[in-house]
From Swiss-Prot:
Function (record text): Transcriptional activator which forms a core component of the circadian clock. The circadian clock, an internal time-keeping system, regulates various physiological processes through the generation of approximately 24 hour circadian rhythms in gene expression, which are translated into rhythms in metabolism and behavior. It is derived from the Latin roots 'circa' (about) and 'diem' (day) and acts as an important regulator of a wide array of physiological functions including metabolism, sleep, body temperature, blood pressure, endocrine, immune, cardiovascular, and renal function.
Alphabetized UniProt keyword annotations: Acetylation, Activator, Biological rhythms, Cytoplasm, DNA-binding, Isopeptide bond, Nucleus, Phosphoprotein, Repeat, Transcription, Transcription regulation, Ubl conjugation
Source species: Equus caballus
Annotated protein name in UniProt: Basic helix-loop-helix ARNT-like protein 1
UniProt-annotated site: Interaction with E-box DNA, residues: 77, 80-81, 85
Region (Interaction with CIART): 508-588
Cross-link entry Glycyl lysine isopeptide (Lys-Gly) (interchain with G-Cter in SUMO2 and SUMO3), positions: 252
Length: 626
């Protein structure tokens, strides 16, 4: 046992000896020792370098400069980014002000919304929301030749294609011979500017400008500065609104040469006229279109400008514009007549006047508003115009007046002719106003007559009888002297009010009396007027109700009444001056509610029509109590 213990202790001591320890730790611990050594060395070196930099003033300065450069670079970058953001914001704001949809918004929009609305607006302008390509314009069942013949036949012209860069005629249809007398072979390949009038070349060049079409994008090499040839496949041609063209130009006509002698052109002016006749005016309508050079067969032009760009051409239809100049009759030039529009109330007062009236009448619109048109009519034309006034209130048709004289601001008269029509409120069924289109009639039209305006038959009655002798005086005609005030009737503004009250009374009676529903406004009933000796007739006539002549009353039926203050026998109620009293006298025995209502309507209308213009109305002799 002791020997075994000694062997074990010797073995352990051998194992724990330094040599054995090196043998065990050599394969495993060598790398770890080296790593620790490296770590210690690296950290030591860094610390030493830091201590050296701190101790060395030169190293400390370099370190400070390095940190300053980093800080300055960061600040410069932030300033650049800030300026870029400011520019972008300013452009976004400017774009928002140019787009109508953005400008109409009350709140400020974000950048994405502004850009989206700008894109939508550009698509709307260029027609890109619903693009029209070549295939959309041609039906599938028509070939190209058939479509070309149909277009030429419908347009009655010739089709031509012109290059926008040089004005070279690339194609022209055979129908050009009918208009310009040039064959197709004579024009193809020639310059369009050689056949234009010298004064029209600049205008045609402006129309050939392709700035509105798709931009010609080119890639430029930064080193050489030359354009780079790209293989970009062009998309389908789009007919945008900016590519449309329509213009007039003068082109040469190849008319057959005629031998002209010198005596035929005695002056330079005649030669200029002959040269002018060799041109004809052509109306060209078409659009600008872009083709790749390979499609046009222009690859032989190996110019650097043609690389990577499309060829813009004008495709148009040329039609002969005929000069239609009417020949003057009797050496006079017919011009459009001057006219103005006015709107009147039912009593003839101005409620609206067109601004063109100032150049014709010399009145400002505010000077005419609220005044009656009868104040400006000549006294000889009041009767005819009153009849037209009554007719336009009773019918829905347009009434054309005869030529009449209208007093302008300087006191003289101008000749007018008017078309009147009334506007009826669809809800109340009442006339609200009268629209009058007034046309100036020249002296030559008055002498020769104008078939477009039929003349109406003038009334045999004079409107002098419509006003009392105290206001307008007895009937007499004053000679009209241009430039001197006169010719109008004092107090004529009441005539329109009297006509309006007459028509309103007619409609009121028609609405209240069942027996008169089917009668005409101009002839309420066929009952003859009562005799002037009857009590009712005397009292009503003495009431002084204004009287207006009716256009439908024949002259033979007019009865003079000395007790009536006016010379005409027509009443404010129409042809029958006392329709209400006569109807009541015939039905005295019956007291139906309809008759009572009709009687009260007549009484109320007489009270309203009187309006303080005449004397008091005496109803003491009426056959029934009030």
């Amino acid at each position: 046992m002791a020997d075994q213990r000694m062997d074990i202790s010797s073995t352990i001591s051998d194992f724990m000896s330094p040599g054995a320890t090196d043998l065990l730790s050599s394969p495993l611990g060598t790398s770890g020792m080296d790593c620790n050594r490296k770590r210690k060395g690296s950290s030591t070196d860094y610390q030493e370098s830091m201590d050296t930099d701190k101790d060395d003033p030169h190293g400390r300065l370099e370190y400070t400069e390095h940190q300053g450069r980093i800080k300055n670079a960061r600040e410069a970058h932030s300033q650049i980014e800030k300026r870029r953001r400011d520019k972008m914001n300013s452009f976004i704001d400017e774009l928002a002000s140019l787009v109508p949809t953005c400008n109409a918004m009350s709140r400020k929009l974000d950048k994405l919304t502004v850009l989206r609305m700008a894109v939508q607006h550009m698509k709307t302008l260029r027609g890109a929301t619903n693009p029209y390509t070549e295939a959309n314009y041609k039906p599938t069942f028509l070939s190209d030749d058939e479509l070309k013949h149909l277009i030429l036949r419908a347009a009655d012209g010739f089709l031509f294609v012109v290059g926008c860069d040089r004005g070279k005629i690339l194609f022209v249809s055979e129908s050009v011979f009918k208009i310009l007398n040039y064959s197709q072979n004579d024009l193809i390949g020639q310059s369009l500017f050689d056949y234009l009038h010298p004064k029209d070349i600049a205008k045609v060049k402006e129309q050939l400008s392709s700035s509105d079409t798709a931009p010609r994008e080119r890639l430029i090499d930064a080193k050489t500065g030359l354009p780079v040839k790209t293989d970009i496949t062009p998309g389908p041609s789009r007919l945008c609104s900016g590519a449309r063209r329509s213009f007039f130009c003068r082109m040469k006509c190849n008319r057959p040469s005629v031998k002209v002698e010198d005596k035929d052109f005695p002056s330079t002016c005649s030669k200029k006229k002959a040269d002018r006749k060799s041109f004809c005016t052509i109306h060209s309508t078409g659009y600008l279109k872009s083709w790749p050079p390979t499609k046009m067969g222009l690859d032989e032009d190996n110019e650097p400008d043609n690389e990577g760009c499309n060829l813009s051409c004008l495709v148009a239809i040329g039609r002969l514009h005929s000069h239609v100049v009417p020949q003057p009759v009797n050496g006079e030039i017919r011009v459009k007549s001057m006219e103005y529009v006015s709107r009147h109330a039912i009593d003839g007062k101005f409620v609206f006047v067109d601004q063109r009236a100032t150049a014709i009448l010399a009145y400002l619109p505010q000077e005419l508003l609220g005044t009656s048109c009868y104040e400006y009519f000549h006294q000889d034309d009041i009767g005819h115009l009153a009849e037209c006034h009554r007719q336009v209130l009773q019918t829905r048709e347009k009434i054309t007046t005869n030529c009449y004289k209208f007093k302008i601001k300087d006191g003289s008269f101008i000749t007018l002719r008017s078309r009147w029509f009334s506007f009826m409120n669809p809800w109340t069924k009442e006339v609200e106003y009268i629209v009058s289109t007034n046309t100036v009639v020249l002296a030559n039209v008055l002498e020769g007559g104008d078939p477009t305006f039929p003349q109406l038959t003038a009334s045999p009655h004079s409107m002098d009888s419509m006003l009392p002798s105290g206001e307008g005086g007895p009937k007499r005609t004053h000679p009209t002297v241009p430039g001197i005030p006169g010719g109008t009737r004092a107090g004529a503004g009441k005539i329109g009010r009297m006509i309006a009250e007459e028509v309103m009374e007619i409609h009121r009676i028609r609405g209240s009396s069942p027996s008169s529903c089917g009668s005409s406004p101009l002839n309420i009933t066929s009952t003859p007027p009562p005799d002037a000796s009857s009590p009712g007739g005397k009292k009503i006539l003495n009431g002084g109700t204004p009287d207006i002549p009716s256009s439908g009353l024949p002259p033979g039926q007019a009865q003079e009444n000395p007790g009536y203050p006016y010379s005409d026998s027509s009443s404010i109620l129409g042809e029958n001056p006392h329709i209400g009293i006569d109807m009541i006298d015939n039905d005295q025995g019956s007291s139906s509610p309809s008759n009572d209502e009709a009687a009260m309507a007549v009484i109320m209308s007489l009270l309203e029509a009187d309006a303080g213009l005449g004397g008091p109305v005496d109803f003491s002799d009426l056959p029934w109590p009030l």
